């Protein structure tokens, strides 16, 4: 480790000791009693001096934090490198599934020279943007800073720091999810695909093509969407990614629903062998369009049973069930637009979709919000919504 890097490590460890001391509401004199002078601890917390191994070990022990020896540090370094390798070669959703493994190592990482990596990796797992330890940013290396910039949505800075396929893919994915700029999203994703192909990163290639297809779907460009989904489907089959194939098929059929091709969509969703909640949601909407009330209600009930074991209100599955209940309410109440209970279901669900899901989910439900505004003669609100979502509003 270079001298300036070692100094940065001491500063970060000092910050950790200070944070843990304050968390426990301890004074400096209380922490360092019998170990070192208060002035010495003060300099340690400010990162102004190198800490002797013996004193550091005693301070960490008093704070009930683990002491990491050289051998364990090497093991942790290998773990951190493996984490970055997986992060940079897979879709972010796959990386997030490793959170439990990270949690097992977290405390040791925070007590080691890898504290900066611990902060950054935890920020990825927790989807933090601006909650990085105060004062830490100036000690980050280019890789750590690039990941932080990506989390903060400072996309060009992230790519400049680390121009790898993953960064281009994530930049495009973020722009797609927020609906900010589909043209830029597609440009980033195409570059990410090309770079991933050069390096043989098949999963990133697949992810880029799916998201490009999603961008075209949200813009209702069916021909371009179909081309991208066909490419993605070939890649998914070659990689034996059967679950991803289901996602592609769902996205395609959902676009048909949004464009009012209910017969085509019904033929697909009614034949899905093991439907997910969102498959049943779209099936219920198709049934609603065709007046198949009983079949639509049964689809929603099935979706509700699938989500009944979750008790976390922030769980994505619970939000999907809320979307299904909107359809059920319309199926069971002919004059739903006149009923206050429908309003209580519609608007909270719509706000959650905007906050927690890719923009396409909210766009899909815009017609139902417009329908309610129009019925209540709230034309100003309806106009503002049309202005915001432009020409990409689905057919009702």
Predicted feature locations:
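A short, Lys/Arg-rich alpha-helix, primarily the initiator
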Residues: 1-23
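Residue register of alpha-helical TPR repeats
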Residues: 117, 140, 147, 166, ...
């Amino acid at each position: 480790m270079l001298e300036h890097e070692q100094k940065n490590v001491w500063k970060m460890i000092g910050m950790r000791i200070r944070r843990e001391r304050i968390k426990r509401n301890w004074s400096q004199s209380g922490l360092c009693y019998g170990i070192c002078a208060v002035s010495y601890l003060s300099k340690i917390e400010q990162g102004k001096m190198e800490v002797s191994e013996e004193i550091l070990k005693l301070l960490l022990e008093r704070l009930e934090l683990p002491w990491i020896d050289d051998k364990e540090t090497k093991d942790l370094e290998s773990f951190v490198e493996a984490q970055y390798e997986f992060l940079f070669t897979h879709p972010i959703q796959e990386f997030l599934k490793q959170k439990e493994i990270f949690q097992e190592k977290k405390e040791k990482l925070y007590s080691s020279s890898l504290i900066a990596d611990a902060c950054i990796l935890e920020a990825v797992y927790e989807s933090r943007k601006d909650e990085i330890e105060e004062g830490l940013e100036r000690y980050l290396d280019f890789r750590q800073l690039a990941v932080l910039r990506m989390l903060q949505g400072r996309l060009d800075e992230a790519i400049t720091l680390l121009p790898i396929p993953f960064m281009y893919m994530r930049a495009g994915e973020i722009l797609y999810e927020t609906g900010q700029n589909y043209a830029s999203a597609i440009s980033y994703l195409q570059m990410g695909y090309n770079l991933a192909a050069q390096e043989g990163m098949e999963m990133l290639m697949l992810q880029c093509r799916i998201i490009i297809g999603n961008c075209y779907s949200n813009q209702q460009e069916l021909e371009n969407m179909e081309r991208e989904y066909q490419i993605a489907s070939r890649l998914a089959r070659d990689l034996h990614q059967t679950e991803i194939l289901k996602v592609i098929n769902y996205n395609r059929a959902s676009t048909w629903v949004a464009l009012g091709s209910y017969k085509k969509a019904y033929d697909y969703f009614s034949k899905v062998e093991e439907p997910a909640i969102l498959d049943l949601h779209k099936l219920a909407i198709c049934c609603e369009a065709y007046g198949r009330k009983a079949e639509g209600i049964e689809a929603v009930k099935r979706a509700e049973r699938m989500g009944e074991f979750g008790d976390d209100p922030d769980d994505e599955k619970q939000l999907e069930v809320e979307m299904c209940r909107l359809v059920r309410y319309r199926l069971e109440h002919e004059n739903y637009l006149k009923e206050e209970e429908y309003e209580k279901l519609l608007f909270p669900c719509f706000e959650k979709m905007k906050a927690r899901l890719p923009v396409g989910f909210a766009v899909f439900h815009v017609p139902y919000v417009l329908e309610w505004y129009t019925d209540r003669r709230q034309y100003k609100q309806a106009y503002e919504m049309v202005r915001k979502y432009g020409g990409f509003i689905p057919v009702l």
